[in-house]
């Protein structure tokens, strides 16, 4: 049932919604290394395979350091964005579980909270703008360059002026290109979560 819901969301027949951790785990083959398509200091991105297409699953690391209110506020922002030059948001997962750990040399257990926070987006197969800037052999025609620049500007205008969302980390790595070389802005919400988690870590453990 969960798989069918995500398929309908990908097809545009349903709105983005809460997705189960088991679903995202299954479509990425238990977040296998072979499905990893990107990573940074904040999240690892996996390719999720569906019968009707592919998705990108961002698994946030150190989820315990993410402010819950901020996470849901960012999800709410993502749910309200729909623009051809912004990567399409498909859903989120906020799973919290308990695990029992036996104390060594004792029959007693301690219980730890296990958090999983994930975001699901459309899969963009043509890579980032950075790849084309760094590789001269890919040489883009002037008209293509112009359309990419215009698309980025239109996407930013939608975020900044219409949604009052500021990217804070715009760079070629965060501009993805689809098969028609249409630019798609990504990671605008994650940059704010990352800054918050860094602040929380510094407050708890001191600046390194």
Where are these regions (language model features)?
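Protein kinase catalytic-loop region centered on the HRD/HxD motif
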Residues: 154-165
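Catalytic-loop of the protein kinase fold
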Residues: 164-178
């Amino acid at each position: 049932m969960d798989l069918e819901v995500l398929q309908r969301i990908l097809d545009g027949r349903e709105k983005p919604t809460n997705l189960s951790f088991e679903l995202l785990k299954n479509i990425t083959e238990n977040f296998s290394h072979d499905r990893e398509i990107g990573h940074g200091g904040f999240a690892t991105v996996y390719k999720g395979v569906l019968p009707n297409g592919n998705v990108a699953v961002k698994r946030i690391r150190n989820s315990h350091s993410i402010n819950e209110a901020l996470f849901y506020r960012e999800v709410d922002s993502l749910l309200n964005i729909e623009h051809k030059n912004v990567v399409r948001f498909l859903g989120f997962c906020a799973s919290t579980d308990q695990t029992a750990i036996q104390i060594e040399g004792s029959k007693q257990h301690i219980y730890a909270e296990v958090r999983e926070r994930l975001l699901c987006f459309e899969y963009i197969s043509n890579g980032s703008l950075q790849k084309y800037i760094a590789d001269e052999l890919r040489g883009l025609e002037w008209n293509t360059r112009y359309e990419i620049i215009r698309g980025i500007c239109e996407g930013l205008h939608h975020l900044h002026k219409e949604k009052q969302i500021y990217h804070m980390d715009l760079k070629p790595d965060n501009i993805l290109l689809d098969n028609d070389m249409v630019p798609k802005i990504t990671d605008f919400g994650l940059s704010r979560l990352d800054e918050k988690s860094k602040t929380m870590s510094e407050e708890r453990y001191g600046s390194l």
